[in-house]
């Protein structure tokens, strides 16, 4: 099969939107039931990596894959077990929803989802949507986010047998050991299940060199180990020809050290973090007819963590427990040709308990109602939605936050100027807000229950094109988007007379450009070359007060220039992949002065892999070399990343 970055975009299009990529490129491709987002014809920016692309790129972690999306800032605290969160177009990680098999993952305490919790081994696709999705057959919670990272897990592929099996072992530098197992069984033509289990451990004791002003610091990261278990069970039932039911159970348990920031002449670190996360979710769908369908989901999530430390003043131990109950239903209808509507209703209940002094034991009740409409014409498509949000909270002690009500509109348009061409123009607008987290509202001393929601407005205009380029390329796809964002009532910590306090004092303006390019060339028989490139320009400025010394300063941890790229060469003997992720200079604090500057970096990696097949068995061998430059660059100041490191992965499939 030829390498085709962006083939997913072609497969997702209908007949009127198809792109001629030639019989040679399409030979051997199989269209599955799961249709991925058609980024080329979307009214809002959508970027997708499917399993085949991830394997060709040699990517082994979710965080490494996300780096290839334009507009993304990955906050990485380093090491195998370091916290990794995703911010899109400088809005902050709290504005990025993370969905797992279509159901949102919530964290009412911090509002941030650590994507290092998820494995790439059982993932079928990663999709980043910025703004409002063209898919109106979705949950109301999806409409309530400024952007969304959707993680879809693999469904069983049985072919000519009633079971499938995949075993994988990864090992590498710093004591990495990461075995995993995926097994699926088909009981009947209508009932099947899958099981996935994984163990991860690493010492994380890597050497680093960094500068402290003018003095070099050399040492090893201490207390940077991790031990984690992941397990997942799925049940897939086709109740009738029109009804499906999926049930999922998930478990994550980890123990890790928190090395903290590097302190000159003080390598001591003893903080430990223990995490347990369990959830169960189900999805039901009924396709009543070609004009009506309904899907509903339910989820219960339990999250517990313990933070311990051995300080000079004495040991500390804090425990946190949060739960979430989530119910959602979406009705979709197309009463007349080319016009469709949807109505989605979500209910969310959250609660938090901690061992901290004066814990207020907050509870939150959220109702989200989204009405959407879409009109599709061969030359253009218009999508509009209106989201109604109502939130009320209760606390056992102290003052609860006020009730919140808001209507949030969104609209997108895509236009095809030439009917037989794959060139499109698009524009979108979305008004949305994020509610303060429980930490923002109720955390000991710094919490402020009078906080207002953080409001955002997003504008995007862009163009996309995909197709053949004659002798230039067998396949080429290009998207260019310019955008402007406003954030009002930004929630930040500000100093008071005695302590820091969360307050609504910030306003941020962001404008930028995202560019995505993918191409494929057939060099000779069984020789293929693929290329991807992503570039982002992002000017995110503090415009809170004209008289402030921070006026028009770039906000912290937001590079003006960043990007990623990849080359894949497929040959009859071995395949090679080269990937690079780079970031320009950033500032660690709001004030843009030299002492706050974090250097630019580029992370280069190379993968070599070969797949052997014999009598229904498949064996894949892969060797990776990451951070070839060996630089201990910093994504977060004083948290140096590992230098040059290596991984070996062996995968057996049956």
Segments (PLM) and residue ranges:
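N-terminal periplasmic "start-of-domain" segments of outer-membrane beta-barrel proteins
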Residues: 23-55
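Extracytoplasmic beta-strand/coil segments of soluble accessory domains associated
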Residues: 63, 67-104
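A beta-strand signature from Gram-negative outer-membrane beta-barrel systems
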Residues: 120-166
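Flexible loop and strand-edge segments within Gram-negative outer membrane beta-barrel domains
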Residues: 202-208, 217-228, 236-295, 300-324, ...
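Membrane-embedded beta-barrel scaffold of Gram-negative outer-membrane proteins
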Residues: 291-307, 425-428, 454-511, 516-520
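Structural signature of Gram-negative outer-membrane beta-barrels, strongest in the C-terminal barrel
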Residues: 336-485
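Gram-negative outer-membrane beta-barrel transporters
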Residues: 337, 379-382, 477-486, 504-588, ...
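C-terminal beta-signal and adjacent terminal beta-strands/loops
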Residues: 483, 582-589, 597, 608-654
């Amino acid at each position: 099969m030829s390498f085709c970055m962006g083939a997913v975009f072609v497969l997702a299009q209908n007949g009127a939107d198809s792109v001629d990529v030639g019989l040679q490129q399409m030979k051997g491709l199989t269209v599955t039931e799961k249709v991925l987002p058609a980024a080329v014809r979307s009214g809002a920016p959508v970027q997708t990596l499917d399993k085949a692309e991830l394997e060709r790129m040699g990517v082994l972690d979710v965080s490494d894959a996300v780096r290839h999306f334009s507009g993304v800032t990955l906050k990485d605290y380093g090491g195998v077990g370091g916290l990794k969160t995703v911010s899109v177009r400088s809005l902050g990680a709290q504005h990025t929803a993370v969905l797992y098999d279509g159901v949102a993952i919530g964290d009412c305490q911090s509002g941030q989802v650590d994507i290092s919790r998820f494995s790439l081994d059982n993932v079928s696709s990663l999709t980043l949507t910025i703004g409002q999705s063209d898919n109106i057959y979705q949950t109301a919670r999806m409409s309530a986010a400024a952007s969304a990272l959707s993680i879809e897990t693999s469904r069983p592929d049985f072919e000519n047998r009633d079971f499938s099996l995949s075993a994988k072992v990864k090992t590498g530098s710093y004591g990495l050991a990461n075995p995993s197992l995926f097994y699926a069984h088909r009981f009947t033509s209508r009932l099947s299940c899958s099981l996935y289990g994984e163990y991860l451990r690493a010492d994380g004791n890597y050497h680093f060199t960094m500068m402290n002003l003018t003095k070099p610091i050399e040492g090893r990261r201490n207390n940077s180990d991790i031990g984690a278990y992941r397990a997942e069970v799925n049940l897939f039932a086709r109740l009738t020809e029109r009804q499906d039911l999926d049930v999922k159970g998930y478990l994550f348990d980890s123990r890790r050290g928190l090395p903290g920031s590097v302190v000159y002449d003080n390598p001591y670190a003893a903080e430990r973090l223990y995490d347990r996360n369990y959830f169960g979710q189900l999805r039901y769908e009924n396709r009543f007819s070609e004009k009506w369908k309904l899907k509903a989901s339910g989820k219960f999530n339990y999250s517990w963590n313990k933070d311990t430390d051995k300080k000079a003043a004495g040991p500390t131990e804090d425990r946190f427990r949060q739960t979430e109950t989530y119910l959602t239903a979406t009705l979709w209808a197309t009463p007349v040709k080319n016009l469709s509507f949807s109505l989605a209703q979500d209910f969310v209940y959250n609660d938090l308990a901690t061992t901290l002094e004066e814990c207020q034991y907050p509870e939150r009740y959220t109702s989200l109602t989204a009405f959407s409409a879409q009109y599709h014409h061969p030359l253009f498509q218009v999508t509009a939605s209106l989201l109604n949000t109502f939130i009320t909270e209760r606390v056992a002690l102290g003052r609860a936050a006020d009730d919140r009500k808001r209507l949030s509109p969104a609209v997108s348009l895509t236009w095809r100027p030439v009917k037989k061409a794959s060139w499109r123009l698009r524009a979108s607008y979305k008004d949305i807000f994020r509610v303060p987290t429980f930490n923002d509202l109720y955390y000991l001393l710094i919490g402020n229950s009078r906080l207002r929601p953080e409001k955002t407005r997003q504008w995007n205009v862009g163009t996309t094109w995909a197709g053949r380029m004659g002798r230039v390329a067998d396949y080429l796809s290009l998207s260019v988007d310019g955008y402007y964002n406003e954030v009002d009532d930004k929630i930040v910590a500000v100093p008071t007379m005695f302590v820091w306090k969360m307050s609504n004092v910030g306003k941020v303006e962001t404008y930028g450009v995202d560019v995505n390019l993918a191409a494929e060339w057939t060099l000779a028989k069984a020789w293929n070359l693929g290329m991807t490139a992503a570039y982002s320009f992002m000017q995110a400025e503090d415009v809170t007060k004209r008289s402030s010394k921070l006026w028009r300063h770039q906000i912290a941890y937001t590079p003006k220039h960043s990007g990623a790229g990849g080359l894949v060469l497929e040959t009859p003997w071995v395949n090679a992949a080269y990937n690079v992720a780079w970031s320009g200079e950033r500032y660690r604090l709001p004030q843009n002065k030299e002492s706050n500057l974090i250097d630019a970096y580029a992370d280069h990696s190379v993968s070599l892999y070969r797949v052997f097949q014999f009598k229904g068995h498949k064996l894949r061998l892969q060797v990776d070399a990451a951070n070839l430059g060996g630089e201990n660059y910093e994504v977060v100041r004083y948290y140096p990343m590992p230098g040059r490191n290596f991984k070996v992965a062996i995968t057996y499939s049956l």
